[in-house]
Every structure is written in C-alpha cells, then in structure tokens.
From Swiss-Prot:
One of its GO terms (biological process) is heme biosynthetic process. Belongs to the ferrochelatase family. This is Ferrochelatase. Fe cation binds at residues 196, 277. Pfam families: Ferrochelatase. It catalyses: heme b + 2 H(+) = protoporphyrin IX + Fe(2+). GO terms for cellular component: cytoplasm. Catalyzes the ferrous insertion into protoporphyrin IX. PANTHER family: FERROCHELATASE, FERROCHELATASE, MITOCHONDRIAL. Its EC number is 4.98.1.1. Pathway: Porphyrin-containing compound metabolism; protoheme biosynthesis; protoheme from protoporphyrin-IX: step 1/1. It is found in: Cytoplasm. One of its GO terms (molecular function) is ferrochelatase activity.
Length: 387
C-alpha cells in the first residue's frame, strides 16, 4: 500500500498570552460555536466577545504557565502514533490540523498537498462526535475538498467518533483505577465524569448526537472499570444565558457535597489532552467549588496524553478504517435531515420580502445595541456573564 497520511484534528490553543485574543476571535467566529440567524453578524460579534473576554482568559492562562500545552501534547501523540503504526506494519505520515490556532487545518492540508499523498485517514482527537467539535472541522474540510481538484484526487476516509473503542475504554479505565488505588478507601470514592457542554438546542433542534455518545461512553467506561463506585456525569464550560446540557458541573458538585460525599475523583471524559479546561477549570475552579461544598478530598484523573494503550487505540482505528469502505464528509455531516450543520442549513427568518426587510432592521438594531454595550460596559450581556 502507498504511504498513508493521518490527519489529527483538534481544537488548538494559545501558546502565549498574546495569542489569547486572536484565538478567541477565531473560536467565536465559528458558526458552529455561536449560531446566528445572520452570517454577517458573526465576525463583529466574535470581535466584541474576544475583546471583552481576553483579559479574563489571559488571567486563566497565567494560572497554567502562560499558555496552552495542547500543541506540544498533540505533537507527542502524533509522534507516538507514527511509531506505533510503524510497529504494526504501516508507513504513515502524521499531520496536525487545529481548528482555531496554529497549526491550522488549512496549514495541514497545504502540507498534505505538497506531499502528494494518495491515501488519507482523518481522525479527530474527540472521542465523541459533536457538531461544534469534529463537525466543525469536517465542515471546513468539506468546503476545501469541494473547492480544490487536487484534494478530490486523494482517497480519504473519516473516523467520526470512537467513544466505544475497547482500547480507548481500557486506557480510560486504567487511568481511573490507578487514581482510585492511591486512595485509602477506593470503593468509597465518588467518580465524577465532567464533559464539555454544548447548548441544549444543539441536541434538541440540530440533532447533535453528542449527549447520547457521552452518556454511552460513561456507561462503557464504568463497565470496563468494573468497580462498585457510585458515579455522576455532568457538563462543564457553559457560556452565556442559554440552557446547556445538564447537570452543570458546578451544580452537581454542590449537590454531591450536600449529600455528604467526601472523596471525589474527577474524570475529564471529553478531553484526551491536558489543556485549559483540565488544568485551570477543573483543577482550580471546580476544586474550589468542591471544597466550598464540603468535599474534603478532590482528585483528578490525568488526560490520556500519550498513554500507550490509547496510542494503540488510535493506531488500530487507523488500520481498521483502511480496511473498510471509506466514510465521506457527506455521510457524517449530512446523515439525516434532523442533524443540521451551519451554514449549509441556516436559520430562516421570514417568509416574505417585507418580513426579510424587517429582519434586517432588527439585526441592525441588535448590532447597534452590542456596540453601545461595548462602549458603555453595561448591558444585558454583561449581566448574564456572556461579556
């Protein structure tokens, strides 16, 4: 077989404090992160939010050393994966494509084109599929494929999600068991799975399978672990006033404290690498919430990073994908009518020309209100914590 390329997809993260604001701008410019009825509002709103949130976000990054370790960890994962694939008989070139910071997905694709690969496996480093993570990267890649004849000549296949892969589950169970066994009474420890949240509307209205895959993944990990511990699944990182998946991590921690839980082991189930949401949000913010709730012992399972069983899981996923019929963008992004990727299926306001005129006027009023709030520093978005 010809040399195989493997494109690892991930979020990306600012490597120094100066990167924080442009990183946030890229993040909030993504219509899969903030869905707006009018695409022309996307970048002005992203500029507004990134301008107002950058200082607070920089303070958070200062608490973990001044930048995200995500790129270095992903590079280590890529190196380990290339080595493991070589051990099982595959000559592979690994590429890294980050969605919101360097090396961007576009940079990875440029390298792939220069290397003139014929076969490519696209592997997101998100175990569970979501419109806002893997889906967002797939959407960008699909647009690039549709516009570039050179890319159309590449035989590619996607691995949409792999939350139920036995080797991945074994790696997660191994890390949990290691942390439990450090405790005086392992069976008394409450296992707390904290997943990155998404707006409830993504599941209810857009058909995102993320919640179902997270819940199934949690059950499978506990089955693989085969311990009698009680456990909870909650969702972190909520932003803004809209309802997100529940229970929220901070609320669940308070409730467990009220129930008398003394020993808690947090498992970051959405993340395979250490980054701001494990090192700062869980280790610092949620630790404080737990302590205030009366939970005496707060432990955390480390992210998978380059755990050998996890790397073997990725290698086997790549191998399996090469033996099966290819999985295409169309199969994953547009599998059924009730899963809606933006902007291919934009929200439509109004059925008549007159209605659309009023929609435009309302949008302009809303944008002016945003600018006024930016200048004054006061308003409903500040009140609810979005800005």
């Amino acid at each position: 077989m010809d040399r195989v390329g493997v494109l690892l997809l991930n979020l990306g993260g600012p490597e120094q404090l100066e990167d924080v604001r442009p990183f946030l701008f890229n993040l909030f410019s993504d219509p899969e992160i903030i869905r707006l009825p009018f695409p022309w509002l996307q970048k002005p709103l992203a500029w507004l939010i990134s301008s107002l949130r950058s200082e607070k976000s920089q303070e958070n990054y200062k608490q973990i050393g001044g930048g995200s370790p995500l790129r270095k960890i992903t590079e280590a994962q890529a190196e380990a994966l290339e080595q493991r694939l070589a051990e099982i008989g595959h000559t592979a070139q690994i590429y890294i494509g980050m969605r919101y910071w360097h090396p961007f997905t576009e940079e990875a694709i440029a390298r792939i084109k220069r290397d003139r690969l014929k076969n490519l496996v696209i592997l997101p480093l998100y175990p569970q599929f979501s419109i806002s993570t893997s889906g967002s990267s797939f959407r960008v890649l699909e647009e690039m494929w549709n516009a570039d004849p050179q890319l159309k000549a590449i035989n590619y296949t996607l691995i949409p999600s792999w939350y139920d892969d036995p080797r991945y589950l074994a790696a997660m169970a191994d890390l949990i068991a290691q942390e439990l066994d450090k405790c005086e009474e392992p069976n008394r420890v409450h296992i707390f799975f904290s997943a990155h949240g998404v707006p409830q509307s993504y599941v209810d209205e857009a058909g995102d399978p993320y919640q179902a895959e997270i819940e199934a993944c949690t059950r499978l990990i506990m089955q693989t672990l085969n311990r009698p511990n009680d456990y909870t699944l909650a969702y972190q990182s909520r932003v803004g006033p809209v309802e997100w998946l529940k229970p929220y991590t901070e609320d669940a921690l308070k409730e467990l404290g009220e129930q008398g839980v003394q020993d808690l082991l947090v498992v970051p189930i959405s993340f395979v690498s250490e980054h701001i949401e494990t090192l700062q949000e869980i280790d610092i913010e949620y630790r404080e919430v737990a302590e205030e709730a009366g939970i005496e012992n707060f432990y955390r399972v480390p992210a998978l990073n380059t755990h050998p069983v996890f790397i073997d899981s990725l290698a086997q996923l790549v191998t399996k994908s090469l033996q099966e019929p290819p999985c295409t963008f169309n199969q994953v992004i547009h599998p059924k009518e009730n899963m809606k990727m933006y902007p291919q299926e934009r929200w439509q306001w109004g059925l008549t020309t007159a209605a659309e005129v009023w929609n435009g006027r309302l949008a302009m009023v809303g944008f002016i209100a945003l600018l006024i709030e930016l200048i004054s520093g006061h308003g409903p978005l500040h009140f609810v914590g979005l800005l």
